[in-house]
Amino acid sequence: MEKWIAAPVAVILLLTALVSAACAETITFQDKLGRRVNIHLPVRRAVFFETYELTAALGVWDRVVGISRYAYANDLLLAVKPDIVRTIPSVGSGFDVNIEALLRLRPELVVTWAFNPETIRFMEEKGLKVVALYPESIAELYEVMRLQGRLFGKEKKVESCIDRMNKIFFLIGERCRKVPPQKRKKVIWLGGKQTSVSGAKGVNNDLIGLAGGINPAAVLKERSLDVSMERVVAWNPDVIFIWGGAKYNVSDLLASSQWRHVTAIGKKQVYKAPQWGTWSPRLAVVALWMAMK
């Protein structure tokens, strides 16, 4: 009797294994550092140092085993997953990885940014599979979003997000196209330092263009760069946006004698952005916020 029971059980187990193998897939992704990374799908254990806001849109919390400590202060993540601090361990950040904590989590994939290649090499030496991202345009952001859709089998959700983002961008574009080129404002985006400006590369430059502005710092073919105060004064921007994570505020620029000759200061057209991610679907909301200024 036991033999008759064991036989069908063995067949079921064999069929399950065959189905699992058939569903398994490997994709090759060339990341921002030019590395070709082979990734086995579906990813079941992932650590996010970056692009963690996208997990909220995709609803893949059961696949996230570790996260950047900065995620603990993210308003979106705290709203959709109030228990994030208790349920998802921090593994440091892309700047300072806690390698012991990371290895304990046994991730199948680590998603980080390309800013720190040495840290990426260090993680790889420890046997971890790492993808380095740094979207430098809206088009590249869409590529990153589609990659994560593939990783977790959420392609339809990603396309839905992209469709909604495009609708917002189209709405902004329709309004801004009515402004003649000669009347478009010069707009700069400041980073962590008061003289750190966003150049031609990066989503910030795309945001300025979408909002109907002209980025004079786009002559710099960089993501961001420290420039002299004299150069900022020469650009004489009409509007200034400050990165939401900067340690200084609008009042600091308005009170500075160095900035007093800049048009944006005189007209009080200086705004500090909300701390919303620009490597996520919330980029569209940031663009809308900028266009309304």
Language-model-detected regions and their locations in the chain:
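A ligand-binding cleft/hinge motif common to bilobed small-molecule-binding domains
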Residues: 116-125, 242-256
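Alpha-helical, coiled-coil/dimerization segments enriched in small aliphatic residues
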Residues: 197-224
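Proline-aspartate-enriched helix->loop->beta-strand connector
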Residues: 98-112, 228-245
